[in-house]
Amino acid sequence: ECGYLYFLPGLAPDKNHYAAQVGSKMKVESSEDGVSWYDCGETNEKSHVFAWQAYNLEHQGKYVRLTALNEKVTISEAALLPAAKDKVPDIKAEGPGAEYLVDEHETVPLYKTYMNSSYFDEIYHARTAYEHILELEPYENTHPPLGKHIISLGIRIFGMNPFGWRFMGTLFGVLMLPALYHFIKNLFG
């Protein structure tokens, strides 16, 4: 019995490879037999990119059907969790390209935390750094892009995950300390 749908909203280039295509508006249905389907509602369109989302299934069942409600829906990974949330079971997906939704079930967390999702301003900066890698028009353009290009180096080295988008900022913060020490020492003698 499935109690929760977990999914990770992502982004992909649009048809013209100009801007990012982002969306998570899906119709969710569940079934015990795969024939009679119960409407469980719709997911939120305003989900944060690269942050795991949990959707409570109103009607628990053995089967879950997801239907994209617009062409912008981009989901990187999905999983079904039992109501007890004690483990992430293996699931089978059917439909064109559906196998890619469930191919990394071992990466699905039982709970959303800062260790597995973007939070605070990372929803802008990690996303924009990834858009720079994909050579897309950046979503966030209020700050100069140098910082996001530096973040994108960490993503290129370690992948599009929390470690990848946090590494370069941490490294530059550590390297800044000796520079700051010498600057202050020279300033005050």
For the regions a language model picked out, list residue spans one by one:
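Conserved hydrophobic/aromatic pocket- or pore-lining residues that grip, position, or stack substrates
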Residues: 129, 150, 184
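Transmembrane-helix motifs of polytopic, lipid-linked glycan transferases
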Residues: 163, 167-188
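Transmembrane helix-loop junction
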Residues: 131, 156, 185-186
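Sec/Tat-exported extracytoplasmic proteins
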Residues: 9, 133-136, 157
